Amino acid sequence: MNMSVLTLQEYEFEKQFNENEAIQWMQENWKKSFLFSALYAAFIFGGRHLMNKRAKFELRKPLVLWSLTLAVFSIFGALRTGAYMLYILMTKGLKQSVCDQSFYNGPVSKFWAYAFVLSKAPELGDTIFIILRKQKLIFLHWYHHITVLLYSWYSYKDMVAGGGWFMTMNYGVHAVMYSYYALRAAGFRVSRKFAMFITLSQITQMLMGCVINYLVFNWMQHDNDQCYSHFQNIFWSSLMYLSYLVLFCHFFFEAYIGKVKKATKAE
């Protein structure tokens, strides 16, 4: 396995993290993500049915705490994985940053890679607040949560190429997104342009995901040992990112462009 020499400073908890046990656990338990997804789907439909005849819950303080916790986690994750990826990109080049498997077991990043995939299970809790507060639940929201959980657990066990980019981008977008949610939940007035920026960042993330999949597919065929993945993973990843791209573009149009056109016609 290709290990990159890294000179970035490690914190003690990052040094003590046993990535071999983590990878082995995921190889043995990744299919539990299907169980979590099924329970999540059952909660969505069951919870909405139960809340039909009930008054909504405010849950403002718990929502602030929840969003703030995920924001802080994502900020730290983005800083640590971002530092690693930047180091590899500048010292080894683009191909190594995409193909290097040491993101999963190297210093600094190994802890945050595992923390990332595990976090996709508790992040399902976002939907609890939407259900209990009787807010609009769109398809993109729960589809995104389920598929990210399934794909993250499925991919981590194989340590496939491209994972470093996928995780770092997601950390970065979530750092901004959950900070925005925390501010909104706390009652701060946040510019509409900030929300537009977040959605554009998500669209950019999905475009980059498609590009990374193309690069992995291309490099894998020339040297699978140096850029390890498999066609099944690339197929599911490409399908996932393409579907996200379409859905986020549709959401952007409906939420920002479509509303402006309707408001203009009304005037």
From Swiss-Prot:
It is a multi-pass membrane protein. It is an enzyme of class 2 (transferase). GO terms for cellular component: endoplasmic reticulum membrane; fatty acid elongase complex. Pathway: Lipid metabolism; fatty acid biosynthesis. It catalyses: a very-long-chain acyl-CoA + malonyl-CoA + H(+) = a very-long-chain 3-oxoacyl-CoA + CO2 + CoA; hexadecanoyl-CoA + malonyl-CoA + H(+) = 3-oxooctadecanoyl-CoA + CO2 + CoA; (9Z)-hexadecenoyl-CoA + malonyl-CoA + H(+) = 3-oxo-(11Z)-octadecenoyl-CoA + CO2 + CoA; dodecanoyl-CoA + malonyl-CoA + H(+) = 3-oxotetradecanoyl-CoA + CO2 + CoA. The reaction is stimulated by the presence of HSD17B12, the enzyme catalyzing the second step of the elongation cycle. InterPro entries: ELO_CS, ELO_fam, ELOVL6. Keywords: Endoplasmic reticulum, Fatty acid biosynthesis, Fatty acid metabolism, Glycoprotein, Lipid biosynthesis, Lipid metabolism, Membrane, Transferase, Transmembrane, Transmembrane helix. GO terms for biological process: fatty acid elongation; fatty acid elongation, monounsaturated fatty acid; fatty acid elongation, saturated fatty acid; long-chain fatty acid biosynthetic process; long-chain fatty-acyl-CoA biosynthetic process; positive regulation of cold-induced thermogenesis; unsaturated fatty acid biosynthetic process; very long-chain fatty acid biosynthetic process. Glycans are attached at N2. Optimum pH is 6.5 at 37 degrees Celsius with hexadecanoyl-CoA as substrate. It is found in: Endoplasmic reticulum membrane. The chain crosses the membrane at residues 34-51, 70-90, 111-131, 136-156, 159-179, 197-217, 234-254. Its EC number is 2.3.1.199. Highly expressed in adrenal gland, liver, white adipose tissue (WAT), adult and fetal brain, cerebellum, spinal cord, testis, skin and peripheral nerve; where lipogenesis and steroidogenesis are active. Weakly expressed in kidney, heart, skeletal muscle, lung, and spleen. N-Glycosylated. Induction: By SREBF1. HAMAP family: VLCF_elongase_6 (MF_03206). Catalyzes the first and rate-limiting reaction of the four reactions that constitute the long-chain fatty acids elongation cycle. This endoplasmic reticulum-bound enzymatic process allows the addition of 2 carbons to the chain of long- and very long-chain fatty acids (VLCFAs) per cycle. Condensing enzyme that elongates fatty acids with 12, 14 and 16 carbons with higher activity toward C16:0 acyl-CoAs. Catalyzes the synthesis of unsaturated C16 long chain fatty acids and, to a lesser extent, C18:0 and those with low desaturation degree. PANTHER family: ELONGATION OF VERY LONG CHAIN FATTY ACIDS PROTEIN 6, FATTY ACID ACYL TRANSFERASE-RELATED. This is Very long chain fatty acid elongase 6. The gene is Elovl6.
